[in-house]
């Protein structure tokens, strides 16, 4: 919290512009398919386009009567080969990276230290894990190439290096050790995913 982490502001600016271009290209494709411009972030408008105009699938509604446009619904429709929901998912992903990370991290750079200072919350989770906020530096994406680019914006001081560590299944590992559950310890030592056993 006090020391902060150094970020490459120029790299973040470049990323934001890159994401902006990608978003614009995806929007053009979405509008071409829908044959009109609309607010892609509006689930109401998106639902009207998907179910009423394009008739991509039989009408799906939520319990409250709204059009179903959740990620799982879009993934299901995209899996069935429909390009429109695939583009919407891609648009959401890139928009999230831009708004939550490349733009937001720049806003969190302290003008005096030139670093990002997060706040660690010691009692915010029921599992005892730390939580991070303003900004959350514990959920930096890594699954996609664009997400990995966000991580590249974190840099070390000259002559130093940054390392990344992940406490894989930490709560279960502590349980196995404290309770001395031999089968569980063996599963971890054998690199097994205990949730698939």
Predicted regions and their residues:
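Conserved catalytic alpha/beta cores of large enzymes that bind or transform nucleotide phosphates
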Residues: 151-175, 185-197
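Conserved "right-hand" nucleotidyltransferase catalytic core of DNA-directed polymerases
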Residues: 1-145, 159-161, 168-171
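Cytochrome P450 catalytic domain signature, combining two hallmark sequence patches
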Residues: 56-60, 179-190
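Second-shell residues forming the walls of enzyme active-site clefts
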Residues: 148
